[in-house]
Design a protein with these regions (language model features):
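Conserved, mostly hydrophobic/aromatic
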Residues: 30, 135, 195, 205, ...
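Active-site-proximal helices and loops of the catalytic beta/alpha 8
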Residues: 239-248, 256-257, 262-273, 327, ...
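Short, solvent-exposed loop/turn segments at secondary-structure junctions
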Residues: 138-141, 209-210, 255-256, 337, ...
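Carbohydrate-interacting/catalytic domains
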Residues: 1-131, 136, 142, 148, ...
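Hydrophobic faces of well-ordered beta-strands that scaffold small-molecule active sites
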Residues: 131-133, 203-205, 249-251, 339, ...
Length: 616
């Protein structure tokens, strides 16, 4: 392999950049060295799982020692397309290498990707320059203290700083998750001024429906708030109070399974004689797949008997979730601004499309976010390529690839590879989806950010090892500095940053349940709050962070320097994970970046408006 002929990240080679709506013309420009002799280059474009189409490129002229070719094509249908270039008379092809560059190859290589999405794909504008905040409801704030438990099998935790319970003998079914710290709607409402001051514009709540585990992913009643959190009316009051603070609330939609301990399945008998498990004539029977071939007699989520899977093609289930007066209708009418779909990969595309229709019937400003751990444009699940990020399904997804890239950078990984990972997502995702992608460093499903960044690697160790393990006190200064560097990254990349509750006070914890401790409202760790607040304010005031394109300026050594280009402003972000003071040029001037620090500089795009907007 030799010489670069094409770079998909360069607008002089491919225009426009990245994904395009169906009906949009896209132009490819190829340069071929003269010393290769006569060539007849073709673009080979293949729609996913279809036959390739060869397009002959047009010769447009010469510059010294280089021949130029061009081609414009207009994909008319949405889908996933892949392409490379054939030179034909040279019997070689041009394939993609890291960084989007093309090289000559005698053998097959990696193709470029072209995502084509629905031309009417729109996503909520209110989210795009905002800041999200994820709350695990039982563990944030108790507004009505010293509760009586609504069910006898719940354990009330008055010791708010105590570690969440786990019992090693219960590993077959995980563990009971029956200890409750009492977090509630009243507590969240009480802390709305705190969240507003932090710069939060959207709260993402983990499940709030009645359920019999503290995580509430085993839904018992979709139409009723868990009584420990409050009533449906109190949830509605919370949404109204949040709106007055400029904050919207989205909910977790767990629609791939219910709890076995639910009014729908009712294996445990808590809900009387009915339910699909106990009554063959139950109206919920068609929701589930009962078969003696399953170890427990029914299909369950990843084999957990307490989580029977639903059949998302059951008409009565679809109507219950998506129909008038159904789950989506009920909670959006109560004041929610959208849903995050749990395990979106495990929901059929047509079911997600019906959910979208139900959500958007309440207005285009309602959000539908999906849990996807990989590149959502190329994701395959159960033998099917998923189509949910092309404009008919999800608005956006959780941006795990960006989290992985941020952690790789903070752990000393190859910076060029980090930059390539970032640009691949920017290149593959439709702009409406990228602008709403949820960027984060930690969630309820991952280690706490500071633990993942600076803690001893878990490496699959059990919960006994994870219990009470923390970063040594003499390492905390460095850990906090790295955590802030990580947050600077996710606040300034395309997408919407999300702070997991407690990250702003450097809460620690390995995997579930240690990443779900109660928020320490007496914490003296306040070093992160100010910078996070400032970054959130910068996002709201600078249009470079509202859909501005990403350009990599330099990615080598310990330096990751990138640019966001908006309609009226441009921002340059310089991250320095290294131990030495860095001098870097931005906007034609030298600026210094502290060891382990970052700098954000902003200029107006108009020639008469020059100079730095802000420096951190």
């Amino acid at each position: 392999m030799s010489h670069t002929f094409y770079n998909s990240l360069d607008s002089s080679c491919k225009s426009p950049f990245g994904a395009i709506p169906a009906g949009q013309a896209v132009t490819f420009n190829l340069t071929v060295p003269e010393d290769l002799g006569y060539v007849d280059p073709h673009l080979v474009l293949t729609k996913d799982r279809e036959n390739p189409v060869h397009y002959r490129m047009e010769f447009t002229g010469q510059t010294p020692r280089v021949n130029h070719f061009t081609l414009t094509v207009t994909p008319t249908t949405s889908g996933l397309y892949f392409y490379h270039f054939d030179l034909y008379t040279d019997f070689r092809r041009i394939y993609r290498t890291p960084g989007g560059e093309g090289v000559l190859s005698w053998t097959e290589g990696q193709e470029w990707q072209l995502t084509v999405y629905e031309p009417d794909f729109k996503t909520p504008d209110w989210l795009k320059n905002g800041t999200m905040y994820q709350i695990f409801p039982d563990r944030f704030c108790e507004g009505k203290p010293n509760k009586e438990m609504p069910f006898a099998d719940r354990i009330y935790r008055a010791d708010k700083t105590g570690e969440p319970y786990f019992w090693p003998t219960e590993q077959d079914e995980g563990y009971l998750n029956m200890d409750y710290y009492g977090g509630d709607f009243a507590g969240i409402q009480q802390k709305l001024p705190y969240l507003r001051d932090l710069g939060v514009t959207c709260i993402y709540l983990n499940p709030i429906f009645e359920a019999h585990a503290n995580h509430r992913y085993n839904t018992a009643d979709y139409l009723k708030a868990d009584p420990l959190l409050g009533t449906n009316e109190e949830f509605s009051a919370l949404c109204l109070a949040a709106a007055r603070e400029g904050i919207r609330i989205i909910l977790d939609g767990v629609f791939s399974h219910t709890g076995s301990d639910s009014r729908y399945f009712n294996r445990e008998g808590r809900y009387g004689p009915g339910g699909a498990y106990r009554d063959r004539n139950s109206p919920y029977r068609s929701w589930y797949d009962f078969d003696s071939g399953y170890p427990c007699g029914y299909r369950s989520w990843w084999g957990f008997e307490t989580l029977p899977e639903v059949q998302e093609d059951s008409p009565s289930y679809v109507d219950f979730i998506c129909g008038k007066g159904g789950v989506i209708d009920t909670w959006l009418n109560l004041g929610a601004s959208g849903f995050r779909l749990d395990v979106a990969d495990e929901l059929p595309d047509d079911f997600i499309e019906k959910i979208r229709t139900a959500v958007k019937s309440h207005g285009d400003d309602k959000l539908l976010l999906g849990e996807v751990w990989e590149d959502a444009t190329t994701k395959e699940a159960f033998g099917q390529r998923r189509t949910y990020l092309r404009g008919r399904g999800l608005d956006a997804v959780m941006n795990y690839p960006f989290r992985n890239a941020a952690l790789d950078y903070l752990h000393g990984g190859d910076v060029a590879a980090v930059a390539d990972a970032l640009m691949q997502i920017c290149e593959n995702y439709p702009a409406p989806a990228l602008d709403c992608a949820m960027n984060f460093l930690s969630t309820h499903d991952t280690e706490r950010a500071i633990t993942a960044i600076a803690g001893e690697p878990c490496n699959g160790r059990d919960r006994c090892w994870q219990s009470k393990r923390c970063i040594p006190a003499d390492k905390m200064d460095d850990a906090v500095r790295k955590l802030l560097l990580g947050y600077a990254m996710i606040f300034t990349l395309p997408g919407v940053p999300c702070v997991y509750y407690g990250d702003e006070i450097a809460m620690q914890g390995y995997r579930d349940p240690f990443n779900r401790a109660f928020f320490d409202w007496n914490s003296t760790e306040q070093r992160l709050r100010g910078p996070i607040k400032t970054l959130a304010a910068l996002r709201r005031s600078c249009d470079a962070f509202d859909g501005g394109r990403l350009e990599i300026v330099r990615a080598e050594g310990d330096v990751l320097h990138y640019r966001r280009v908006g309609k009226t402003q441009t921002a340059e972000i310089i991250l320095n994970r290294g131990p030495h003071l860095l001098a870097e040029e931005a906007f034609g001037k030298n600026t210094e970046v502290n060891p382990g620090g970052f700098t954000v500089l902003v200029e107006d795009n108009e020639p008469e408006h020059v100079g730095y907007f802000s420096v951190y």
